Amino acid sequence: MCIRDSLGTAVQRIADNSNVKGMIYTVGNEQDYHFKVLFKILKRLGYDWADNLYHLSYGMVDLPSGKMKSREGTVVDADDLIYDLINTVKQTTESLEKYQSSNEVLNHDEYRKIALGALKYYILKVDPKKNILFNPEESIDLTGNTGPFIQYAYVRIQSILKKVNKDVDINMNYTLNEKEKEVIKTIHEYPSIIYNSYKDLSPALLANYLYDLVKSYNSLYQNYHILNSESSDSTSIRLIISINTSHVIESCSDLLGIELPNKM
């Protein structure tokens, strides 16, 4: 990167956006020295907003084939990576027995959402300062800490809620079981997770919170019936939990820039 170009760009950005008082540069850690020098020069030139410039130093992303180096021609084009990942998602999905026996047919847009969700989540779940080894096959695993795992849970919740055609009433005297308590507790933590993610400039906090929420809900789902449960009171509380879990998944995914498919 050229200091001269970066100086001009920084000054022009502030000039074009007078309400902006600072900037966060999300750039790989190989440019740490560049930004240290850039910020120092801007401060010496007397720009008072220079104190509000911050380099969010990101770890480098490598592939299983090795480190990407532009000078050696080993850089993978992002469009090519996304295209290949979409095809991998499509092939993997169509090979599943439950997909072959289902009437559900996924379109290209849904495959795209799953592939991009896998890519974004795989990167965002890692602390920004750490290097990332992106494994395409691992990123689309439906049982691990992945974007598709979260997307699938969301689709399943939506499928449950579509079967409900009446208002849900809660019995305030209902005694929650441990699984229900755990999901409610995790939902309650969401606002503080947003704040900490903002304070620490770490989307990884949001991403891993989302995974924990889905794991907690899945544990409830696997151990207890949601719709045809042991009583109308338990059905009602689990539907309320499902609705609120769905809302948090939507909100958190939106903050992470991850789209949610309608079916999987």
Q: Language-model features: where?
A:
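Non-catalytic interaction-recognition regions
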Residues: R4-M264
